[in-house]
Every structure is written in structure tokens, then in C-alpha cells.
């Protein structure tokens, strides 16, 4: 687990809400406090969609919606002349990307033993922190998956020109 302090909150928010920077992440949950508190559960309810629409939900069939699907809703909740009092977003890496990370990093973990790789975003009204996390279905003292996930996130931040400092 690694904590990253975002150096340019305004630029980060633009990338989060107005671009596709985070669109491939799955949304586990999100909450924002503005004039009221709003909570979004990222659980996918595929029975809501017609059979034709459901066929196009391949990535989301793992049970969570893609950020790109709820980003406009989250933007609507946050836009206005006042900054949100706070927000928290919990992203999770899509299962096919978890498998790619394992393969590319040469790890011995089995994908079915990994419940999720997470990126938690926390804004407190002035500071924005990103915290990596993992959840395994098995006990292990091996932290190689955490290190690989942190390395992947650091490369992601660099590629997307998101300036962070580590704690």
C-alpha cells in the first residue's frame, strides 16, 4: 500500500471528470459531499439492460461499472462555483488488467486468489490523496503483488502527467 499526494488538484480533477484518463477503471464506490452527501455504489445490475445492451458489457460483467459510465453523473454532482467539501472514490482494476499485471510482472499469484487491486481517491476540501490497496482471497506474506501494483500506478501517473509525491 502506497500513499500519493496529488500536487496539482485542479489538473487532476480535470483529468478525472472531463477526460478518459480513468475510464478503464471499475468503480467500486464513490461518495461526494456538496450541498448534500451523495453515495454511488458501483455494483453492476446487468438485468437493468436489454439483452442487446447486456452483450456490450463484457468488461463490466465482473460485477462493477466502468468509471466512464458514471463519470458524467459524478461531474453533475460536483460542478458549480463551489468546490466539494469532500469526496472519496474507490477504483478497482479490471480483472483482465490484473491478469496482465501478474503476467508482465512475472508474479506467481493466481488471478482467482486476488479479490481486487484498488486505487482510493480522497479529497478533504484542499488535499487530494491517492492510496493503492489490494485484497487477496488467500493469506500470504508475499508483498510482490502490492509492489507491482504500486509500480504500475506510478507509471500510470507519469504517463498521464499526474504529478504526485509519495508519503
Labelled PLM ranges:
Residues 7, 28, 33, 46, ...:
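A generic structural micro-environment signature
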Residues 1-67:
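Charge-rich, low-complexity N-terminal segments
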Residues 10, 14-15, 68, 79-81, ...:
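Context-gated lysine
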Residues 128-167:
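Mixed-charge, glycine-accented linear interaction segment located at domain edges/termini
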Residues 39, 44, 49-52, 104-110, ...:
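General N-terminal targeting signals
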Residues 61-127:
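Surface-exposed, low-hydrophobicity interaction/linker segments
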Residues 22, 30-34, 43, 110, ...:
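Short, surface-exposed, charged/polar-biased interaction segments
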